[in-house]
Amino acid sequence: MGVSRVLYVEGGTPLKGELRVYPAKNAALPILAASLLTPEPITLVEVPRLRDVEVMLELLAHLGTQYAWEGRTLHLQTPEIKSTHAPYELVGQMRASFIVWGALLARAGEGHVSMPGGCAFGFRPVDQHIKALEALGAEVWEEDGTFHARRTRPLSGRVVFDLPTVGGTEQAMLAVALGGEATLVQAAVEPEVVDLGHFLALLGAEVEGLGSPIVRIKGAPRLKGGTYRIIPDRIEAGTYLLAAAATRGSLTLEGVRPDHLDALLDKLWRSGHRLEVGEDWIRFRATPDPAPFHVEAREYPGFPTDLQPIATAYLATVPGQSTVVDRIYPDRFTHVGELARMGAELYLRDRILTVQGRRLHGAQVKALDIRAGGALVVAALSAEGASEIEGVYFLERGYEHLTERLQALGARVHLRESPVALAAD
């Protein structure tokens, strides 16, 4: 027998209290990749201390970056690129690490990156990344599970994406930031993409149109260093709001960007909950009798796909019928079977999930990706009885100090070891 860590949750306690939102992981990762573009020192203030960030730093160190933590502040410098190969053992752990491809191509003239890994839900191709780099003038090919690219001049051109793509947009921005120039059509408008653009502007690139479908970027021959503060994590903020809603609690979030959460806040308001919103804070008070609603996850400013599983868990506690559709990842429903183990009534047909809300009960469940894990935590907090959630690894990739922060809000949760049968040789 071996042991694994599980999150033990005794449900039924409304969450109450105040919470300061941590910086956004999905903004930090491409900004970390962008640090490869300059030999000058970079300081990032308030960086999330998550497993995904540590994996990205391991990859950057392999490529030539020197870094040091000072509390939650991160100091980085890449005097030279020591390797242009991003190996599978690092890239395979996290899809976002694929973004170093464009930065390597810009700084070193070539980049070789293994097929990305990360959360296993749906089909998430990299064809738009390849299309962007080829449109900008790079030679791109794939061999034995590794993507290769090289250039003979600074990359420039016009990229027309087939659809808005966060990763593809970020990849193109990094590829041209050092001496190149590009117009990106159907660019992603997510806050994390905008944050990367602001960071590149700090380093010396000229960026226009951020937050719109057409972005123009003109790189500088040499980028400088600087100090930057990453935006708050809208997905973390949304997860805690939905947890408070599911447990019929009350929550004040500080250090948040309410304008990044318009789609969720509108749904919560229409569900009957009370909300007060300031420039950088949200006060939430749950109604005891919330109404069901329809969720359709789509590109920003629509409802975030990363909050779709967590919203599903909340709706499973709301009497009446709700429906959930994900236009970004239509098969992102790895959480459905596990929620059903807790008594949730869920029916998936033609990629439309129908949710019939009811009181949930505790169960042994397993997180299969980061946000499915968040969904199971929300469900367990609201359920009657105790739950054990396996897959703590995924939770630690997406939620910093999750156990401690939930405890501070009154939740009865803790990590503990659970026996696991080992496979025979």
From Swiss-Prot:
Keyword S-adenosyl-L-methionine set for record: no
Location in or out of the cell: Cytoplasm
Active site positions: 119
GO CC field: cytoplasm
Annotated residues for binding of phosphoenolpyruvate: 25-26
InterPro entries: Enolpyruvate_Tfrase_dom, Enolpyruvate_Tfrase_sf, MurA_subfamily, RNA3'P_cycl/enolpyr_Trfase_a/b, UDP_GlcNAc_COvinyl_MurA
Cleaved signal peptide residues: none
Binding-site residues for UDP-N-acetyl-alpha-D-glucosamine, renumbered to this chain: 95, 124-128, 306, 328
Modification type 2-(S-cysteinyl)pyruvic acid O-phosphothioketal: residues: 119
Gene: murA
GO molecular function, one term: UDP-N-acetylglucosamine 1-carboxyvinyltransferase activity
The protein's name in its UniProt record: UDP-N-acetylglucosamine 1-carboxyvinyltransferase
Protein family according to the UniProt entry: Belongs to the EPSP synthase family. MurA subfamily.
Keywords: Cell cycle, Cell division, Cell shape, Cell wall biogenesis/degradation, Cytoplasm, Peptidoglycan synthesis, Pyruvate, Transferase
Catalytically driven reaction(s): phosphoenolpyruvate + UDP-N-acetyl-alpha-D-glucosamine = UDP-N-acetyl-3-O-(1-carboxyvinyl)-alpha-D-glucosamine + phosphate
UniProt entry tagged with the keyword Nucleotide-binding: no
Job description of the protein: Cell wall formation. Adds enolpyruvyl to UDP-N-acetylglucosamine.
Domain of life: Bacteria
Biological-process GO terms, alphabetical: cell division; cell wall organization; peptidoglycan biosynthetic process; regulation of cell shape; UDP-N-acetylgalactosamine biosynthetic process
Native species: Thermus thermophilus (strain ATCC BAA-163 / DSM 7039 / HB27)
EC id: 2.5.1.7
Biological or metabolic pathway of the protein: Cell wall biogenesis; peptidoglycan biosynthesis
